[in-house]
Amino acid sequence: MSLLMFTQLLLCGFLYVRVDGSRLRQEDFPPRIVEHPSDVIVSKGEPTTLNCKAEGRPTPTIEWYKDGERVETDKDDPRSHRMLLPSGSLFFLRIVHGRRSKPDEGSYVCVARNYLGEAVSRNASLEVALLRDDFRQNPTDVVVAAGEPAILECQPPRGHPEPTIYWKKDKVRIDDKEERISIRGGKLMISNTRKSDAGMYTCVGTNMVGERDSDPAELTVFERPTFLRRPINQVVLEEEAVEFRCQVQGDPQPTVRWKKDDADLPRGRYDIKDDYTLRIKKTMSTDEGTYMCIAENRVGKMEASATLTVRAPPQFVVRPRDQIVAQGRTVTFPCETKGNPQPAVFWQKEGSQNLLFPNQPQQPNSRCSVSPTGDLTITNIQRSDAGYYICQALTVAGSILAKAQLEVTDVLTDRPPPIILQGPANQTLAVDGTALLKCKATGDPLPVISWLKEGFTFPGRDPRATIQEQGTLQIKNLRISDTGTYTCVATSSSGETSWSAVLDVTESGATISKNYDLSDLPGPPSKPQVTDVTKNSVTLSWQPGTPGTLPASAYIIEAFSQSVSNSWQTVANHVKTTLYTVRGLRPNTIYLFMVRAINPQGLSDPSPMSDPVRTQDISPPAQGVDHRQVQKELGDVLVRLHNPVVLTPTTVQVTWTVDRQPQFIQGYRVMYRQTSGLQATSSWQNLDAKVPTERSAVLVNLKKGVTYEIKVRPYFNEFQGMDSESKTVRTTEEAPSAPPQSVTVLTVGSYNSTSISVSWDPPPPDHQNGIIQEYKIWCLGNETRFHINKTVDAAIRSVIIGGLFPGIQYRVEVAASTSAGVGVKSEPQPIIIGRRNEVVITENNNSITEQITDVVKQPAFIAGIGGACWVILMGFSIWLYWRRKKRKGLSNYAVTFQRGDGGLMSNGSRPGLLNAGDPSYPWLADSWPATSLPVNNSNSGPNEIGNFGRGDVLPPVPGQGDKTATMLSDGAIYSSIDFTTKTSYNSSSQITQATPYATTQILHSNSIHELAVDLPDPQWKSSIQQKTDLMGFGYSLPDQNKGNNGGKGGKKKKNKNSSKPQKNNGSTWANVPLPPPPVQPLPGTELEHYAVEQQENGYDSDSWCPPLPVQTYLHQGLEDELEEDDDRVPTPPVRGVASSPAISFGQQSTATLTPSPREEMQPMLQAHLDELTRAYQFDIAKQTWHIQSNNQPPQPPVPPLGYVSGALISDLETDVADDDADDEEEALEIPRPLRALDQTPGSSMDNLDSSVTGKAFTSSQRPRPTSPFSTDSNTSAALSQSQRPRPTKKHKGGRMDQQPALPHRREGMTDEEALVPYSKPSFPSPGGHSSSGTASSKGSTGPRKTEVLRAGHQRNASDLLDIGYMGSNSQGQFTGEL
């Protein structure tokens, strides 16, 4: 038991120890290096420390390793000079280092260990400092000239670390802060050395070991030679003595020697004295040259030269020659001279005063320059450059000159065909070999190389043959079939050149001739020079080229001329010499030449092309002009130029006189150029006066306000004489014709600034028209009190304008000003400165509203409007007074019409049918009210006829039968005629064809309601009816003095004694045939003449007008009125038996009541009026009316059908606008009679014998309204032009219903308005013909062709509006039924 307990206790204790030990070891951690050793450099024998610190649990142990081996420390060996410090650092008491043994130098690491692991530090090197004694490079002595830089260089001894360097001068350290001294590496640099810089210099190398001094070096500073007295240029005559002095100084003393033209002086002729003076006893021309005194010492050399000039007459070394150059090219005329002194060479174009000198600064626009040697070069040749150029050489000993001609040709003239430099050579090659046929060409433009074989294009599609980049033809795998002649063709826009060679392909083993080597060929000859030119020959000379393997044995000369061929031609073969004359050339032809050399190996490359040369021309035998004589005489001509006269700002007249007139003068050349307003003087412009006796010319198209230089020169062919003296003239100025450019407006200043900056550029130079003197700036507000104007000098291009008001729109304009005035203003630049300096640049184009507002606010506009209103008011008052006064005399008279067997009886000189809208009827103008109000509850559309003129009447509106409207103006009394019992007017026995009558008035739809009557008896009779009598026949005459109650909104408007009744909404009207005018003319009438006159005058009425009613007018003083209006009413023409169908429907009716101006026609008028009255009273009793009522209360009938009176010319001119305006404000209310009945006529006017009947409909049976007019075969086709088709619906009888046309009153016709068709009523005439009505419209001035419409039309009851319809049956009896 006890043993068991002991065992248990022992086990528990063991477990406790294990558990407790595990808890303690959990706090241990492996070592970690917290401080690593660093590299160190230390001197030999000096102490040093390598630091290392580590942490860990348990505390780690530290060991050191050098180059991988453990370091022995004092712990290992107490005598060791290395000690391991408690912190772990390794301390060296001294560094041991020797040549062979280096125990301390190496790479060290420290290692920290415990039972959990180890940590290794970074490597740290320990190096031993070293500095050797010997310099790798010691400085050397330096000798420099004063002012030059000096450089001393050394390399310090080897050491570690690398030693640094500094310098000592005379054992004193040099301060390198001085600007002239700099030390870079081992170099000491002293710039701009001085004498004081001379001395002994030592280089010192140092590092942590110590210092080492180099061997000393000496810096020596010398002085270059300088001249105390220089030789000077001298000019002497031949045989004179001359001396050149030369005195110098320097350190060391320099030596002096002389040279002439960079060569030593020849002995014998020159003496040099002790003071180095050069003396020439007797000068000759060969002594001329440059003599140089040379002073030299150790540090430098100085030279001074002087020129000796020996005077002698000038001579030409190279003379200028004639040249031919294409436009746009460059030409050079050589002119080399010699002389003593050297001649001054200058050039001049013959006839020009401008001289060109060598080394002269070239003008910006000049294309000519002269080289120092005297060569004249002209670039970009122009046609105007052609002429003679003179080279002149001038010295004190004399002068010489030479002349050469420049001929300018077309561009292609100087562009020869391509040149083949090397062409293919004859070759013999074996089968399966490779052939190379060379072809190298050049030219301008670069030519294209192509090949031909036996004249055909090659290689084609053969893959064995290719053309290489340089044009060489290569053929691989040769075959026997490749044998042939191959031609190389070089082609460009200037022509083509070809070169042929033979290729012979043989079997293997045959003799093979290889291609030549270029090195075996001779070199190209030099450029051929032209030595002589005749009419048909040119002599050339050249120099041989470099010889090849074999020298050249002969030469070939090739030539080209644009006028002869387009390729190079061989003109000479096997030429043995280098001088040859080419013959057989054309006269006056330009040629180019080139030469090739020949040797047994082949041809050389061509020589450079010769200059273009023109053969001489064949002078006309009769001319025999001696050029020298011509030039001499032209040189003697003296032209005196007068002061030019300015004619206009762009024209100047030039006049001159000539002292004597020589034989050889063809004319005078006026030369002028602009000299002001340009940076450089412009070129001369020419105006030739080709008449020798001419002494004046006018220069045109000149610039305004510009100064011109003018001179005059005589000429004869290409020869030109001396210029006159130059005169200057200034054209007059004008105001600038263009505004300143690039006008910009910007704001300037601070946040709340009210200033703007305006900048601009001058107007274009061509539009300045003079010298700009100032600029004017306008800053215009919307009111004059805001305007700000400024004027600035012409040199100013911007200005600041202040004091602008915020919120005001300003327009900124700028204009330039010359002495002639202010020019065109710039476009306005709108700108608005906001309340918070918000600048708003508005668009340039103001809105129409703003523009109108600006105009309306102008005082002139307001005054003009006020004056115009006053004039209109006064005119209206005068017209109103005259009109009322005149109406009082028109209200008590009547005119009646009657028709007898012979036709309509009128006043003896007028047909009975009148046009109410024609100004020829002055007393009828106010008889008819006008309306344009639409129909209530009716279908309307945009295509309805809506143009109603004076005399139009709308029907009454249903439901308003208790109201009546005034239908007539005061003074108009209407009566009607019954034609029911009369015989037919449309009998087939009497008429076979209807013809239009030029003066028949078309009845407008609304006019039927004014007088609704049946067609009358052939015998028209008149009767003065009272209103009560007419009421029995269903007529309603308006009360002329009764006011109208109507209008818009139920408002009442007074209408006292007014001819303008109020308007009322009405329906469209039916159309009823009307009685025609007489076919036979009345005695004394001239209807035909009148019709033609109306066509010629293109008469046009103001609006649509209804026909004149058959009615009577009471008129007093008719004859006076007729005389008063005689001048305004044309006399009707004489009418023939039948009207011509060609009469246009577009012509207005010419029927009027105006009598003939002849006094004898007035009694006849009164007789006709009486007859009409009696006939009418007789026929009234025979009228029969059948009225059907639908239990409706009796309604007053509409006014009778008839003809509408014309208007006075004065009324038409003054009343129309006023009446129209009033009509638009008033509505006419008209009672609607017989509302239960409507008429639907059937019309078939293709057959004039057919009947025209009416059929009654009740209001409940009314069909859709139809067109306001019935159309027949003679109706104008204008309806189809003025109205678009509307949907139709078929009814019984096959008639078509159409939508009603709503009338609208318009102020003027538009392009959409056309003629209103109307069925022509046909009436019997003694001649068996009938007259047809015509349709007319406003704006119709010419004849219109008619179109037959073969269709019956059903008329809506609303169109007829209970009117008694008039028709005719087959027997010709007219019937009416209500």
UniProtKB/Swiss-Prot annotation:
Q: Name one GO biological process term.
A: retinal ganglion cell axon guidance
The answer to whether keyword Nucleus applies is no
Phosphoserine PTM positions read S1156
InterPro entries referenced in this protein's UniProt entry, alphabetically:
FN3_dom (IPR003961), FN3_sf (IPR036116), Ig-like_dom (IPR007110), Ig-like_dom_sf (IPR036179), Ig-like_fold (IPR013783), Ig_I-set (IPR013098), Ig_sub (IPR003599), Ig_sub2 (IPR003598)
Q: What GO terms are given for molecular function?
A: axon guidance receptor activity; identical protein binding
Q: Where is the signal peptide?
A: 1-21
Record topological domains on the Cytoplasmic side = 881-1378
Comp. bias (Low complexity): 1058-1067, 1319-1343
Stretches of Acidic residues bias are at: 1215-1228
Q: Which domain of life is it from?
A: Eukaryota
Annotated PROSITE patterns: FN3, IG_LIKE
Write down the membrane topology.
Answer: Single-pass type I membrane protein
**What residues does the Fibronectin type-III domain cover?**
524-618, 637-735, 739-836
State the PANTHER family in the record.
CTX-RELATED TYPE I TRANSMEMBRANE PROTEIN, DPR-INTERACTING PROTEIN ETA, ISOFORM B-RELATED
Question: According to its UniProt record, which protein family does this protein belong to?
Answer: Belongs to the immunoglobulin superfamily. ROBO family.
What is this protein identified as? Roundabout homolog 2
Q: Which organism is it from?
A: Homo sapiens (Human)
